[in-house]
Design a protein with these regions (language model features):
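Bacterial N-terminal signal peptides
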Residues: 5-16
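Formylglycine-dependent sulfatase
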Residues: 2-4, 18-327
C-alpha cells in the first residue's frame, strides 16, 4: 500500500507540469532486439551481417562498447529496464513472470508529464503494466519458440505468423503514424527478431553459410553455419524495420528532435551465449542517436547498465529520477 501511495504521490507532482503550450521536449524511440549479440552488427564489428540502417544510425550517433544488461534472459531483462531495478527487486526475475501491478515504471512518469506513450511488437511484461502506456500493440507470437521447444500458444510447434508480422515489427510504423501530433512521443518498439524459430527464405538475398563468422567455441560444421546464416537473416530483417522507423520519423519531420536508443534484451540464442554471464550473453549493442546533441560517429567505453536507461529517458523529459530506481 505504501508503494502504491508513493507512486500516486509522484504522479500527482508531475501532473501540474502539463500546459496547453507546445511541448518541445524530445521524442524518445526505444528499439529493443530479441536475442541479438552485442557484436553481431556491422557497426559493432561483424562485417558478415548486413545491417545498413543500424550502421548509418551508429555513424550519425554514438556507440557504447561496454553496455551490459542485468540478466541474460528476455522478460527479466525487460522488467529490469522498465523499472530501473535489478531482477531480484522486480518480482519478475524468472522467464515469463509478469511485472506485479505495484511496480513503478518510467513509462507512467513520462505519460503523466504529457508524453504519448506507446508500445508495439513483443510485449513479454505481463498484463498488469499495460495501462502505463496509452496504447500497446502486442505482436502475435504464434510459433514463437519457448525454452521447452514448444510454441508460445496452445503448446504446438508451428511457424510464426505470415509475412512481416513474423518479425514482430509490423506495427512499428503504424503506431507512429497514429500518434497525436501535439504531444511528445515515447515509443517502446520491440522485435521478435532474431529470436528462434528461424525461417528460410525471409530475404531475397539470404546470408550464405560459408560466409558467416562462427565464434571460436562453436563447432565449425555445416549445420552450425546454416543456423548462423538464418540468425543473420533475421538480424537483417530487423535492420530493415529500423530503417522504416527512421524513414517515418523523417516523413513526420520529427527526426531531428527524436532521441533513438537501440539495444538487445540479451545475447544470441546459441550455446554459451544467452542465459550465461559471458559477454556474448549479457553484453548488448547500445547505439544512441540525437541530431545536434550527440556527436556523430563517436564511441564511448564508459560502463553502462540497462538500469541506467530509465533515468536517462526521464532526464531527457525534464523529470527527476525516483529514489527507488537503481539507475
Amino acid at each position: 500500500m505504501y508503494r502504491f501511495i508513493s507512486i500516486c504521490s509522484l504522479i500527482s507532482l508531475i501532473a501540474p507540469l502539463l500546459s496547453h503550450a507546445k511541448d518541445n521536449r524530445p521524442n524518445i524511440v526505444f528499439i529493443i532486439a530479441d536475442d541479438l549479440a552485442w557484436d553481431d552488427l556491422g557497426c559493432t564489428g561483424n562485417p558478415k551481417v548486413r545491417t545498413p540502417n543500424l550502421d548509418r544510425l551508429a555513424k550519425g550517433g554514438m556507440s557504447f562498447t561496454n553496455a551490459f544488461l542485468t540478466i541474460s534472459s528476455c522478460s527479466p531483462s525487460r522488467a529490469s529496464i522498465i523499472t530501473s531495478t535489478y531482477p531480484h527487486q522486480t518480482d519478475a526475475e524468472q522467464l515469463h513472470w509478469p511485472l506485479p501491478p505495484d511496480r513503478l515504471t518510467f513509462v507512467e512518469l513520462l505519460k503523466a508529464s504529457g508524453y504519448w506513450t506507446v508500445a508495439a511488437g513483443k510485449w513479454h511484461l505481463g498484463n498488469f503494466v499495460k495501462d502505463r502506456f496509452n496504447e500497446v500493440r502486442e505482436a502475435d507470437v504464434s510459433g514463437f519458440q519457448l525454452p521447452t521447444g514448444q510454441a508460445a500458444k496452445e503448446g504446438k510447434i508451428t511457424q510464426k505468423v505470415i509475412g512481416d508480422a513474423r518479425s514482430g515489427c509490423d506495427q512499428w510504423v503504424p503506431i507512429l503514424k497514429a500518434r497525436p501530433k501535439n504531444k511528445p512521443l515515447f515509443a517502446w518498439l520491440a522485435a521478435l527478431d532474431p529470436h528462434r524459430d528461424y525461417d528460410e527464405g525471409i530475404l531475397d538475398k539470404p546470408h550464405k553459410p560459408e560466409n558467416v563468422r562462427l565464434p571460436p567455441y562453436v563447432a565449425d560444421t555445416l549445420k552450425s553455419r546454416k543456423d548462423y546464416a538464418l540468425y543473420y537473416d533475421e538480424i537483417t530483417r530487423l535492420d530493415r524495420f529500423v530503417g522504416n522507423v527512421i524513414e517515418e520519423l523523417h516523413e513526420q519531420n520529427i527526426f531531428e528532435n527524436t532521441f533513438i536508443l537501440f539495444i538487445s534484451d540479451n545475447g544470441r540464442p546459441f550455446p554459451r551465449d544467452k542465459t550465461t554471464l559471458y559477454d556474448s550473453g549479457i553484453k548488448t549493442p547500445f547505439i544512441i542517436h540525437w541530431p545536434k546533441h550527440v556527436k556523430p560517429n563517436s564511441k564511448s567505453d564508459s560502463l553502462v547498465s540497462s538500469i541506467d536507461i530509465a533515468p536517462a529517458f526521464l532526464e531527457l523529459a525534464g523529470l527527476s529520477t525516483p529514489t527507488i530506481f537503481e539507475g
